[in-house]
Amino acid sequence: MEFPFDVDALFPERITVLDQHLRPPARRPGTTTPARVDLQQQIMTIVDELGKASAKAQHLPAPITSALRMQSNRHVIYILKDTSARPAGKGAIIGFLKVGYKKLFVLDDREAHNEVEPLCILDFYIHESVQRHGHGRELFQHMLQKERVEPHQLAIDRPSPKLLKFLNKHYNLETTVPQVNNFVIFEGFFAHQHRPPTSSLRATRHSRAAVADPIPAAPARKLPPKRAEGDIKPYSSSDREFLKVAVEPPWPLNRAPRRATPPAHPPPRSSSLGNSPDRGPLRPFVPEQELLRSLRLCPPHPTARLLLATDPGGSPAQRRRTRGTPWGLVAQSCHYSRHGGFNTSFLGTGNQERKQGEQEAEDRSASEDRVLLLDGSGEEPTQTGAPRAQAPPPQSWTVGGDIMNARVIRNLQERRSTRPW
Ligand SMILES: CC(=O)SCCNC(=O)CCNC(=O)[C@H](O)C(C)(C)COP(=O)(O)OP(=O)(O)OC[C@H]1O[C@@H](n2cnc3c(N)ncnc32)[C@H](O)[C@@H]1OP(=O)(O)O
């Protein structure tokens, strides 16, 4: 990547390491030194352009690396410049690697949640013209040495297929430990961190590991004091989270727009009405119009009035719709996953979510059962009219409660009819 300024003079070393201050490195003796602010502006331009190129290469809707994001996060960026070719005497940039420590909640191979703060690979890009020339490895290797970290100790923020191949080829990283977030960790991540799974050890596992283990210290920071198990949430914020907002608005705005054009395969018509293009708009027969008018004039049924008065939260259908949120979130997390395979374990999103999901499913099937029962589907014809005739107490709208009662009653009836006493 070329720039209209002297990259070669700006970055004297082949690999330059920048933190959130984006400070220009010391220049070679003898080179003219422009104003510091200009140099920083040049660095910001390079970071912005690299971020854009990386996003394009990864088909991301927006860059996840920019000067602004660098300045507002405690990340470190390794920039590799081209020392061989010197187009127009100004040098060129080959690529970059961005890393940073992040607090994550990761699952170990026993599916226990662990609060850790590993070094994460956040963004990585080598210019298309020089990929597969060993530059990525050179940059990665430099970072490993500088950060004093082993490849298996890293967490990778949604690695691209190319990066997965890269890690496999150069570092033999293949087997992943399934996670419920977008980070990928590999077998060996917990290698020297396994301790008895007591919660008191879990929170301090890193600081202890650093003292007790002879192998290189885990790239972890000291964590805050242990929190109650309930406080630990089974997700971790990815640097790419903000992209979700850009991709899809929240419910209900994310619902598919109404079809303006007819579907490719319209459902088969049940009658010939409307099939002829010559026919004008169909009007109902006069008796139907009269019927409709009489229905409009008909006052609401007293039961309906009573139900409306005792139901402050709107219709039950509406309430049921809003209760589906956890599934919606799960669906969203799947939608945004770059690799569906990583998220196949979302069903293990912690007991709480799983239970909630199961409860939802149960509620839904329960409500369907309930409709069948109230339909008078042959099971309990005497009950179909009864609940409508009386004003139900407010809590009777709890679908699960109703169905439980119905099931108990049915169970009792069955037992009564099948047993001789
Ligand atoms: C957390 C994240 O940052 S995810 C985003 C990662 N970045 C990208 O996907 C952007 C596009 N890709 C790239 O920029 C580069 O290919 C990188 C950064 C992944 C690797 O850099 P390179 O300089 O190409 O890597 P290097 O030459 O050292 O190693 C080559 C190996 O990487 C892998 N690799 C690189 N490019 C490809 C590719 N197009 N297809 C498949 N594997 C590839 C292969 O294992 C390859 O070995 P091989 O050529 O023997 O098959």
Curated annotation (Swiss-Prot):
Role played: Specifically acetylates 'Lys-40' in alpha-tubulin on the lumenal side of microtubules. Promotes microtubule destabilization and accelerates microtubule dynamics; this activity may be independent of acetylation activity. Acetylates alpha-tubulin with a slow enzymatic rate, due to a catalytic site that is not optimized for acetyl transfer. Enters the microtubule through each end and diffuses quickly throughout the lumen of microtubules.
The record's subcellular locations are:
Cytoplasm; Membrane, Clathrin-coated pit; Cell junction, Focal adhesion; Cell projection, Axon
In this chain the N-acetyltransferase domain maps to 1-190
Tell me which EC number(s) this protein carries: 2.3.1.108
Broadest EC class assigned to this enzyme: transferase
Family, per the entry? Belongs to the acetyltransferase ATAT1 family.
Tissue distribution is:
Widely expressed with highest levels in neuronal tissues. In the brain, expressed in the cortex, cerebellum and hippocampus, including the pyramidal layers in CA1 and CA3, as well as the granular cell layers in the lateral blade (suprapyramidal portion) and the medial blade (infrapyramidal portion) of the dentate gyrus. In testis, mainly expressed in the internal cell layers of seminiferous tubules, where spermatocytes and spermatids are located.
Q: Which organism is it from?
A: Mus musculus (Mouse)
The effect of residue 244 to R is: Strong reduction in tubulin acetylation, no effect on tubulin-binding
Query: Region labeled Required for AP2A2-binding — which residues?
Result: 308-387
Binding-site residues, acetyl-CoA: 124-137, 160-169
* PTM notes: Autoacetylation strongly increases tubulin acetylation.
A biological process from GO = response to pain
**Where are stretches of biased composition, namely Low complexity?**
209-221
* Gene3D superfamilies reported in the protein's UniProt record: 3.40.630.30, 6.20.370.120
**Modified positions (N6-acetyllysine) in chain numbering:** 56, 146, 233, 244
Q: What is this protein called?
A: Alpha-tubulin N-acetyltransferase 1
Phosphoserine: modified positions: 272, 276, 315
Q: Which GO terms describe its molecular function?
A: acetyltransferase activity; L-lysine N-acetyltransferase activity, acting on acetyl phosphate as donor; tubulin N-acetyltransferase activity
Catalysed reactions, as listed in the record = L-lysyl-[alpha-tubulin] + acetyl-CoA = N(6)-acetyl-L-lysyl-[alpha-tubulin] + CoA + H(+)
Query: Which Pfam family is an annotated match for this chain, by its short name?
Result: Acetyltransf_16
